[in-house]
Design a protein with these regions (language model features):
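PAPS-dependent sulfotransferase catalytic core
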Residues: 1-73
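PAPS-dependent sulfotransferase catalytic domain
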Residues: 51-55, 78-182
Length: 182
């Protein structure tokens, strides 16, 4: 059973990487049968319980520091894992996992992380196109820097379990993404 956690800034187009992985064989997780628990539900519950800020609102990298998660949450994850025992390759993507990377890393030593980043100019262009006129460009850039610094720090501390993907490079050479995951 291989488990992949995809994490990337909301502007990184991480969903396209997730879609590609599903096309080549990664399954979505089976939700727990009793409570319909999904990885996204677990992350949303953790965000609510630990009162994490909205990912796009963070401009100080310290706000992306790892949240120390209580063991009381382990049973939810165990239920999710048990419902995916027969799932050979499964995974999901969620930008809010940035707060809980250490939690997922420690709860299951076999989880692999795919970390997706994009050039900040693309994030800024998307922000300008989708935001009101009062957009603070500095906040958008600071948010991108803070998020991707946490992503890079985690990658550097856990290279044996992580693949770092530049979205532009991925677009031009998708097939090579599966080599580091083998």
């Amino acid at each position: 059973m291989n488990k992949l956690v995809l994490v990337g800034h909301p502007g990184s187009k991480y969903q396209i990487v997730e879609h590609f992985l599903k096309e080549i064989g990664m399954n979505s997780p089976n939700y727990s049968t009793s409570n319909k628990i999904s990885p996204e539900y677990i992350t949303a519950s953790l965000c609510q319980f630990y009162q994490t800020p909205e990912v796009n609102d963070v401009v100080d990298e310290r706000e992306f520091s790892a949240v120390q998660v209580s063991t009381m949450w382990d049973s939810m994850v165990l239920e999710l894992m048990m419902n995916n025992l027969n799932n050979k390759l499964w995974g999901w993507a969620d930008p809010s996992i940035i707060f809980f990377l250490d939690f997922w890393k420690n709860i299951d030593k076999s989880i692999k992380f795919i970390m997706i980043y994009d050039h900040p100019k693309y994030n800024l262009m998307r922000s300008v196109n989708n935001a009101p006129l009062s957009l603070n460009i500095n906040n958008s850039v600071d948010n991108w820097i803070a998020y991707n610094k946490r992503l890079l720090d985690f990658f550097l501390e856990n290279k044996e379990r992580c693949v770092l993907i530049n979205f532009e490079a991925f677009q031009s050479n998708k097939k090579n993404i599966i080599k580091p995951l083998s």
